[in-house]
């Protein structure tokens, strides 16, 4: 029985040579702000936009390391709406909008690592799961006074509620706010804001991968990490990409 070297990896069943995949990963990790499917198609000489689009989503999928460490220490947590023309109502979904929970770890006076997770609404159940997924129990978690965070103490966190006062003004959670601003700028600049909500999770994974490695001076190390993780994640077929067969609908587009 013969087993391909790509079996059980993100490259499984590929018809393209691995060296072309490696070129794609080198190109992706060497572009500071990311790449578009059109840019990848042009750079590699791929036959179709669809192939480039599928490859990029597979690589974004590989950017999440299995069993990755959760945040610890002091972490700010808040939610942000992406897209749509009208402001969303907290605790509820909104047509044409995606609600993302943002967790930012403090590193002195700077932002350390982050975690991003899309949720359907800002209910206590969804917010609790998002925090548990990305933050170690015992961590100091700072939030605003939204009731959806009221169960964090019971979940094993040291919950600190930051309230507006004359000293800090309205910027209650500055690190989270900075991350949200950079995320929106990245979606608008690199992807022209045209990211379907059904595909947003992959873009959040890429932004997290890039942000958490933004201080690395070695592009080669980023390339190595991506290759390493591409070999560690489960296979992903094009048909498995969330929303791959979804029809384009106006409310599925994230405008930031």
Model features per residue range: what roles?
Residues 1-256:
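Residue-level recognition of single "structural anchor" positions
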């Amino acid at each position: 029985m013969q087993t391909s070297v790509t079996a059980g990896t993100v490259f499984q069943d590929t018809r393209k040579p691995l060296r072309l995949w490696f070129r794609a990963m080198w190109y992706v990790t060497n572009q500071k702000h990311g790449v578009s499917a059109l840019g990848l198609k042009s750079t590699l000489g791929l036959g179709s936009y669809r192939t480039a689009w599928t490859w990029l989503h597979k690589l974004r999928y590989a950017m999440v390391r299995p069993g990755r460490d959760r945040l610890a220490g002091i972490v700010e947590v808040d939610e942000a709406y992406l897209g749509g023309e009208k402001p969303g109502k907290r605790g509820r979904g909104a047509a044409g909008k995606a609600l993302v929970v943002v967790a930012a770890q403090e590193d002195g006076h700077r932002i350390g690592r982050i975690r991003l997770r899309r949720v359907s609404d800002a209910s206590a159940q969804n917010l609790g799961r998002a925090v548990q997924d990305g933050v170690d129990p015992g961590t100091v978690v700072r939030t605003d006074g939204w009731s959806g965070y009221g169960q964090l103490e019971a979940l094993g966190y040291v919950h600190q509620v930051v309230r507006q006062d004359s000293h800090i003004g309205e910027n209650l959670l500055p690190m989270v706010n900075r991350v949200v601003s950079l995320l929106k700028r990245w979606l608008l600049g690199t992807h022209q804001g045209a990211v379907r909500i059904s595909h947003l999770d992959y873009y959040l994974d890429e932004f997290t991968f890039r942000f958490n490695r933004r201080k690395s001076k070695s592009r080669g190390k980023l390339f190595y990490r991506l290759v390493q993780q591409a070999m560690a994640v489960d296979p992903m077929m094009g048909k498995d990409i969330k929303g791959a067969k979804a029809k384009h609908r106006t409310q599925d587009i994230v405008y930031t």
